[in-house]
Every structure is written in C-alpha cells, then in structure tokens.
Amino acid sequence: MIYNLPHLKNREAVLLTAAIEYLHVNANGINFRVAVSGPPDGPVILCLHGFPEGSMSWRQFMQLMPQARIYAPDLRGYPGTDQPRGGYDVFTLTDDVKALIEALNLDRPLLLTHDWGGAIGWIFAHRYSPLIRRLVVVNCTHTKTLVRAVFHVTDWQPFRIPWVPFFELPWIPEAFITSSLGRKLLRWSFTSREGQKGTMNREVVDEMVARFQKSSDIKPIIDYYRQMVSTHFTPRKRAKLYDVYKTPISVPVTLVWGMEDGALSSKVAFKSGDDAGCEVEIRPLPGVGHFVDLEASEKLAQEVTRLL
C-alpha cells in the first residue's frame, strides 16, 4: 500500500513505506503483530502506541528515522494482535513488553511511548529498567501522578478525561463506539485535538477508526481502562502497584509534550519526576496537540534522534 504522507514527496513516500515490514511474534503466550523498519545494525527503538491507535501511529515516524531499527507492535487486544479475554492489567501489559524484548532479542532498546503506551512505559521502567537504555514518554503523565491529580482535581484533570468513567459501564461503550455515529465521534476525537488545524494525518486516522466494526473489536482495549480503575479500587492490586513505584526508574527519562493537549494537564505532567524517582528531562512542543505521533512526527523524530 502507498500512503500519501504530508511533508514528503510522493516518490519519497513510496520508497520509505516499502521499508516497513510486519512480523508475527509469540510473546507472553500470545501472538503480536510487529511493524519493523530500518537496518538491523541501527540503534534500536521499541515503540508503544496509545489508545485507540496501533502500530500505524508510528508509520510516519518510522519513515523519518531510516537510520534506526524500529519495532512497533500492535499491543495486546488491538486488531492485528491476539485479543484474549484477559490480561489487560498493567502487570500483564508490562510483562508483554518484557517478553517482546526477549522474543525479538533486543539489546536494551530506547523505549518510545505515547498515551497508554506511556502508562505502560512508566510502570515498565519501574519494574524492568535494566532491559532498556532510555525511556521516552510522549504526552502521558506518570500513572501515580495522574491518579493523584484526578482524586485531588488538580488543574481540573478528572474533567479533562470524561471517557474514563463512561468506559466503566458494561457493553454500552463498545456498542456506541462501533456504531456509525460512534465511529464518526471517534474520528472527531482525533482531529479535534490537533494543535494546529490540518496537521494530523487523516489517512492514518481513518485507517485506525475503520478497524472498529463490532463490539468485540474494541472491548479488549476499553478493558485497559477498566483494569486500571479496578487496580486502584482493589486494595490488594493497588498495594502491589504502589510497591512497584517504590523502585525508582534507573534509566534516563525524557518527557516530550505537545503543549496543546486538552486531555492531560502539562502542569500535572511536569511533576512526573517526583513519582518516577528520577530526574525527567522535559521537552515541550508548542502548538502541538495530544497526538504528537500523528501531527508532528518530524519534531518527534528530531527529539528522538538527539537521544540516539
């Protein structure tokens, strides 16, 4: 398939797109689809996408980083990867990342994460810092910092993410999102959040939204939210997670932030280092919204190149 990429001439787009291939990898008991690009001897980057995205979210970034060996899996429960009934808690999700690193035989990759991938990335780095050489988080507050802000209503944080309580309802969110109206709203939820009008890659947005045709297509990824809420309201699970936070992250951390993010407060996010237990380098991107990977991949590529 040839993709019409903004800021790239058609010929360049064709050549670069051809460099991406897909692998199917068994890890932690399920099969993952993994997009791969770049030379085998290049610096290694492992990318974790956000909600409700997929490996295609990283496509343009991968095309702008021909010097790096990049792996971008579709996470557990997303179309292309197995969708088991369970395993959507953060402990299993971080174990998935560990298993992928081992199955792909990656030697301490740079872990690049966005949104829900960032939540997984923060917790993964607390648990498994020795497996990576650096954590880069794009528009995702440290999970402990974010939960505290929700409970304390810091900078109106709970009102910025109204879909979280909606997702606690049984079956209704799945039925609505996969309706014709719901898919239109889902598309709008991407395009309405760009920092500057017209900068988001609409073709990739359409590709992502089109995957959700029936409730079973999206239930697993809504379960990410349900399991996170359950973890914080179940004393045993919450204690287990907060024990994980006691181990400081021991690799360098960079937080790249699209400053026009309406869902996550930068005022809250920039305090993430307090809960990470380490210094966090903050790299603000003025004029960029939440979906940095879809609307400012050139800027993101520049930030990551600086860290290789």
Enumerate the language-model features and the residues they cover.
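Flexible "cap/lid" subdomain of the alpha/beta-hydrolase fold that forms the substrate-access gate
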Residues: 2-19, 30-32, 71, 78-112, ...
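Short acidic-hydrophobic surface loop/beta-edge motif
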Residues: 21-27
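C-terminal alpha-helical cap of glycosyltransferases
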Residues: 34, 301-308
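Conserved HGGG/HGGXW glycine-rich cap/lid loop of the alpha/beta-hydrolase fold
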Residues: 36-82
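Conserved acidic functional residues
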Residues: 50, 115, 294-295
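Active-site pre-Tyr helix/loop in NAD(P)-dependent dehydrogenases
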Residues: 51, 141, 291
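A short, glycine- and basic residue-enriched loop/turn
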Residues: 54-55, 119, 288
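Catalytic histidine-centered segment of alpha/beta-hydrolase-like enzymes
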Residues: 288-297
